[in-house]
From Swiss-Prot:
PANTHER family named among the record's database cross-references: TRANSCRIPTIONAL REGULATORY PROTEIN YEBC-RELATED (PTHR12532:SF6), TRANSLATIONAL ACTIVATOR OF CYTOCHROME C OXIDASE 1 (PTHR12532)
Subcellular location: Cytoplasm
Disulfide bond annotation, renumbered to this chain: none
Pfam families given in the database record: TACO1_YebC_N, Transcrip_reg
HAMAP family: Transcrip_reg_TACO1
Gene3D superfamilies: 1.10.10.200, 3.30.70.980
Name of the protein: Probable transcriptional regulatory protein Mmar10_2433
Alphabetized GO MF terms: DNA binding
Record keyword Aminoacyl-tRNA synthetase present: no
GO CC terms: cytosol
Amino acid sequence: MAGHSKWANIQHRKGRQDKLRSKLFSRLSKEISIAAKLGGPDVDANPRLRLAVSNAKGQSMPKDNIQRAIDKASGGDDESFEDIRYEGFGPAGIGVIVEVSTDNKNRAAAEVRTAFAKNGGNLGETGSVAFMFDNVGEIRYPLSKADEDTMMEAAIEAGAEDVASEPGDEDNEGEHVIYTAREDLMEVVGGLSATFEDPSSAKLIWRPQNLIEVTGDKVATLMKMMEMLEDSDDVQNVYANFDISDEDMAQLD
């Protein structure tokens, strides 16, 4: 997914890694706590919690942090989080889906709306953008975990629908990306984990059906909007159907 991979590469280039890792652990902890509160602290009996813990392990989150997030949910914490999906249009008319988990939906809505409005975008109604995407499972493994043919064979055997490889660079190793039907995600994760251990990431995503190329001045504007959304504590995931040429990416350095 170009929107995802290009954005990840840009974040690496801009030296945001320490901040991003701290934000990643915060998001993972929040998802673990929410999952445990909604479905109970038993990982084996709670599919959402099992997936959240698997993701945390895949990102090398310390076991103590994982357990603390589970304990927070079962320790009488009165915080109540609501999952909300926002849809809108960004620079060059790209479609954007923003998933938040928040204890204050007015604050979350204001932050998301501001990120769009300040960067030439606008929020739309529910469904105004989602039809441009497919809601599917996505599983990621480092390229070093297996060669392309081995990963492809194992993924298809486990029930996956599609497999792609995202090349790395001097900062990123690159990843195998496995796509599944929404309802098959946990089954495929289980099959692959038996062979390759826990993936670095496994979740439901919004995969764009087609990409819109963003060029010129709109590239910097789009990146600013993406940064504002990602920096919000309430935002869990951002998906967009953009592509950017290597030449335009180089102008951001």
